[in-house]
């Protein structure tokens, strides 16, 4: 009985893990999770780098933040240096907790590693999304490698589907907050 139970648990574990294992290699580009999030909320974005550049190890990942994000804090990663570039706003805006800001995070870069081509890793940024439900926020990503660069920066035009893009930028769709 114990052997049957152990075999059943092993089979269930493999079946549950298989979709997760297949999800990362199937992605051919830098992606972001979640794909959808509530507007006007804090959220941890997780960017996944599933491979290097044509077999070459990843040495840097740069993420450009879209307009409307007034608060952003990158994840510290052992073995990687974090760089934050800011930009001035034309007009100061009220950020979370009533604070007025005239400068926001424009780009976050992690440099170091290297991350071998046959492994994946994730990089996080906690952001405060704007109160703009039904808006898609694009996060253009540039992946620098020992030999070469991959630019995941394409943003679809109004009448173009994202599935038509060769190197799509990671995207999060904002939805209305639940009551």
Q: Across the structure, where does each feature detected by a protein language model lie?
A:
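Bacterial N-terminal signal peptides
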Residues: 8-21
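Sec/Tat signal peptide C-region and signal peptidase I cleavage site
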Residues: 22-28
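Short beta-strand segments of immunoglobulin-like
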Residues: 32-38
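Low-complexity, serine/threonine/proline/glycine-rich extracellular segments that form mucin-like
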Residues: 43-80
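Extracellular adhesion/glycan-binding regions together with long Ser/Thr-
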Residues: 88-117
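Low-complexity, intrinsically disordered segments enriched in Ser/Thr together with acidic residues
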Residues: 108-135
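Short, surface-exposed ligand- or partner-binding patches at beta-edge/loop junctions that are enriched
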Residues: 134-143
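Extracytoplasmic/periplasmic copper-protein system
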Residues: 144-179
């Amino acid at each position: 009985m114990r052997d049957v139970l152990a075999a059943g648990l092993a089979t269930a574990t493999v079946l549950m893990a298989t979709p997760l294992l297949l999800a990362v290699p199937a992605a051919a580009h830098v992606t972001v999770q979640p794909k959808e999030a509530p507007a006007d909320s804090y959220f941890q974005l997780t960017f996944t780098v599933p491979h290097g550049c044509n077999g070459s190890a990843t040495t840097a990942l740069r993420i450009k933040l879209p307009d409307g994000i007034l608060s952003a804090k990158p994840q510290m990663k052992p073995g990687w240096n974090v760089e934050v570039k800011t930009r001035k706003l034309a007009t100061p805006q009220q950020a979370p907790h009533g604070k007025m800001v005239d400068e926001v995070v424009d780009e976050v870069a992690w440099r170091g590693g290297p991350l071998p081509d046959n492994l994946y890793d994730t990089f996080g940024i906690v952001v405060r999304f704007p109160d703009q439900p039904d808006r898609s926020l694009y996060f253009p990503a540039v992946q620098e490698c020992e030999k070469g660069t991959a630019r995941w920066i394409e943003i679809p035009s109004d009448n173009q589907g994202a599935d038509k893009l060769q190197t799509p930028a990671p995207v999060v769709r904002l939805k209305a907050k639940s009551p």
